[in-house]
């Protein structure tokens, strides 16, 4: 008996035998664990290790909408070691954004996003928690408020500048898309750095474009972390250069603003001084960020570092430039494709405003059909088609398992075109928003969420809508538009390009004719 026991112990001490036992136990425990947890949602079958990475080109708003037709409103994919979920129905969106809002309130971040936002020092990609809550409070009250937006002369000034530019090209085809992008770029740049600041704008736009490319670049290390130290695509070098360029540019601007503030304090004559976004954020500046009680006075409850200020500025530049420009261009494109709706909007402008003056802010709320047109544009072409979230803990939806740190993509594009929520969802029909009970985009109707909903809804919604309303109203009131070279409305290119936003694949060209009898 003792001999048998000693032989058994001798076998167990053998490394190979021990390894087999450990692996067997691991497989057994994994099997038991999997049997106890709910199943994953349906989705396309993946390969070992790489999962569904061969389907990367289908992870667009349109590609995921097509997958939803086969697998339903909650679809599971595995990209390397990362679990990904596509949400394409209002019912599942409600679970994510309302019922389990706290579980899904984190933001996923790629290697590029983490590095370029100074390790999530911004608001857009910071994880949900005390730091994020107070950062959002600062931004909503000081940066993104409607009152603050209306006080920014840059919006009105840049719209006026665009109108004058268009009026110089009456009767000729113009690149409307370029005009609009220049408008939103100038608005956000001046709002961030000062109404008289044009120095280095081209350099900053170059940096912004490189950031955009890096944010959207495929990096295999995001899905298989072991490749991170190899950097087979050379992305790490580009990341370092891009952030160094940004540091050099914005550090100079911050230094200039701090010197200006010191000089103003030294010669305080009581005059009210116009402030920009950098000034607003510098009011909270400290060498080290510090959090106190969330009920404390705002000025004392959070201190921002330079990294925080730079990261927030990049949030605003991305959120306020491409998203608003895309919405304006899509609105004009859809109206040129639907002449009857264009005629109705311009008739309303003539009746409410008159042809003897320009549109003023006080007119906007009276332009009911214009508002319907912009809502329909946001339904069909949401500024950010995929809203990204990350789970803070293991959870389940409709009996399906969603593990911690899963990436959840809420497809605002697919939800806005859900045939169970919208009649003729692929048809541009602004009049649908005149009907009683139609969903609104403020975040409580999950059939229509162009700005998200819940804790992580877009804090810049009011500012974006203000610029959208004002720009489209002026463009349509000041000018009559037609397509160039005898092009028919049905011939307009309605394809988009997927990225952080989904702008038109080709720029809109149109011919303006002066409409007003007053000076432009």
Swiss-Prot record:
Specify the species: Arabidopsis thaliana
Chief subcellular location equals: membrane
Which pathway does this polypeptide act in? Aromatic compound metabolism; phenylpropanoid biosynthesis
Please name the top-level EC class of this enzyme. Answer: oxidoreductase
Location of this chain's protein in the cell: Membrane
Q: Which residues carry this modification: N-acetylmethionine?
A: 1
UniProt keyword Metal-binding, yes or no: yes
Q: Which taxonomic lineage is given here?
A: Eukaryota, Viridiplantae, Streptophyta, Embryophyta, Tracheophyta
Q: Which GO terms of the cellular component aspect does the record hold?
A: endoplasmic reticulum; plasma membrane
The chain's coiled-coil residues are: none
Family, as annotated: Belongs to the cytochrome P450 family.
Q: What is its EC number?
A: 1.14.-.-
| Name by which UniProt lists this protein | Cytochrome P450 84A1
A molecular function (GO) held by this record is: oxidoreductase activity, acting on paired donors, with incorporation or reduction of molecular oxygen
> At which positions is heme bound?
458
Q: Which UniProt keywords apply?
A: Acetylation, Heme, Iron, Membrane, Metal-binding, Monooxygenase, Oxidoreductase, Transmembrane, Transmembrane helix
Specify the protein's topology with respect to the membrane.
Answer: Single-pass membrane protein
Please indicate if the UniProt record lists Repeat as a keyword.
no
The record lists the membrane-crossing segments as 12-32
A GO BP entry is: response to UV-B
């Amino acid at each position: 008996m003792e001999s048998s026991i000693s032989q058994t112990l001798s076998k167990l001490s053998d490394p190979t035998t021990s390894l087999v036992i450990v692996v067997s136990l691991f497989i057994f425990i994994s099997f038991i664990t999997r049997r106890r947890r709910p199943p994953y949602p349906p989705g396309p079958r993946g390969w070992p290790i790489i999962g569904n990475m061969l389907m990367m080109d289908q992870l667009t708003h349109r590609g995921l909408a097509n997958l939803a037709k086969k697998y339903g409103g909650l679809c599971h994919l595995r990209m390397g070691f990362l679990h990904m979920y596509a949400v394409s129905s209002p019912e599942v969106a409600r679970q994510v954004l309302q019922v389990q809002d706290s579980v899904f309130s984190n933001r996923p971040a790629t290697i590029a996003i983490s590095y370029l936002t100074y390790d999530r020092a911004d608001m857009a990609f910071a994880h949900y928690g005390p730091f994020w809550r107070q950062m959002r409070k600062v931004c909503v009250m000081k940066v993104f408020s409607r009152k603050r937006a209306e006080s920014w002369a840059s919006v009105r000034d840049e719209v006026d500048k665009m109108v004058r530019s268009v009026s110089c090209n009456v009767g000729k085809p113009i690149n409307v898309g370029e005009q609009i992008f220049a408008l939103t770029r100038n608005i956000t740049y001046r709002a961030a750095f000062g109404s008289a600041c044009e120095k280095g704008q081209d350099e900053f736009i170059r940096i912004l474009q490189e950031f955009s490319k890096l944010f959207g670049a495929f990096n295999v290390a995001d899905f298989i972390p072991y490749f991170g130290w190899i950097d087979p695509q050379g992305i790490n070098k580009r990341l370092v250069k891009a952030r160094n360029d940004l540091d050099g540019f914005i550090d100079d601007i911050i230094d200039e603003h701090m010197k200006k503030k010191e000089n103003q304090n030294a010669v305080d004559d009581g005059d009210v001084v116009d402030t920009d976004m950098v000034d607003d954020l510098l009011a909270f500046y400290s060498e080290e960020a510090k959090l106190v009680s969330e009920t404390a006075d705002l000025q004392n409850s959070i201190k921002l570092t330079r990294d925080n200020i730079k990261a927030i500025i990049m949030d605003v530049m991305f959120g306020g430039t491409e998203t608003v420009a895309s919405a304006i261009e899509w609105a004009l494109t859809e109206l040129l494709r639907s002449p009857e709706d264009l005629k109705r909007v311009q008739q309303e402008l003539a009746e409410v405003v008159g042809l003897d003056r320009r549109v003023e802010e006080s007119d906007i709320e009276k332009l009911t059909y214009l508002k319907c047109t912009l809502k329909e544009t946001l339904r069909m072409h949401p500024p950010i088609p995929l809203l990204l979230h990350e789970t803070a803990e293991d959870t389940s939806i409709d009996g399906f398992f969603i593990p911690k740190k899963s990436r959840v993509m809420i497809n605002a594009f697919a939800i806005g075109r859900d045939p169970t929520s919208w009649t003729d969802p692929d048809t541009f029909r602004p009049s649908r928003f005149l009907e009683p009970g139609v969903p609104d985009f403020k975040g409580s109707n999950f059939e229509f969420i162009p700005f998200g909903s819940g804790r992580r809804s877009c804090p810049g919604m009011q500012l974006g809508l203000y610029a959208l309303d004002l720009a489209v109203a002026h463009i349509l009131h000041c000018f009559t538009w037609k397509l160039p070279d005898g092009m028919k409305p049905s011939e307009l290119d309605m394809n988009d390009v997927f990225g952080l936003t989904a702008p038109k694949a080709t720029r809109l060209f149109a011919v303006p004719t002066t409409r007003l009898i007053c000076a432009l």
